Swiss-Prot record:
Belongs to the transposase 6 family. Keywords: Transposable element. The keyword tRNA-binding does not apply. Pfam families: DUF4096. This is Insertion element IS402 uncharacterized 16.2 kDa protein. PANTHER family: BLL5188 PROTEIN, TIS1421-TRANSPOSASE PROTEIN A. It comes from Burkholderia cepacia. The lineage of its organism: Bacteria, Pseudomonadati, Pseudomonadota, Betaproteobacteria, Burkholderiales. Residues 129-147 have a biased composition (Low complexity). Residues 106-147 are annotated as: Disordered.
Amino acid sequence: MAKPIIDDELWTLIEPLLPPPKPRREKNPGRLPVSNRAALTGILFVLKTGLRWRDLPAEMGCGSGVTCWRRLRDWQAAGVWDRLHELLLAKLRAADQIDFSRAAVDSSSIRAVGAGQKLGQTPPIARDPVPSTTSSPTPTVRRSPRS
């Protein structure tokens, strides 16, 4: 198996958040499933490198890219990533490790309760005394009289 991307301490935080494995069939149970830690290693490797799921190297021992993708999908549906995000933020806050001085707040993430100051009616733009070069008719070229 590939070197784990996450250390044991972080894994002990993540493991309880993962949903229990699906029960295996008694008759024809198929292959043994890939461990959650191996699948997480594959998921993080693909997301970090930008590799396509199908190009995940088999030598990593993370299962196929499809297996990792399915695990990612299932964990997303189970709310694992949201809970992990909340847990890590709480731990960082408790350790006073969050620096909000570099945070950027987007206007779409904070509701503007009131509108800006109301202005009067915008005055009409005065007509430009110089004719426009883009909308003036093309001058006709006069030919010299034929001799």
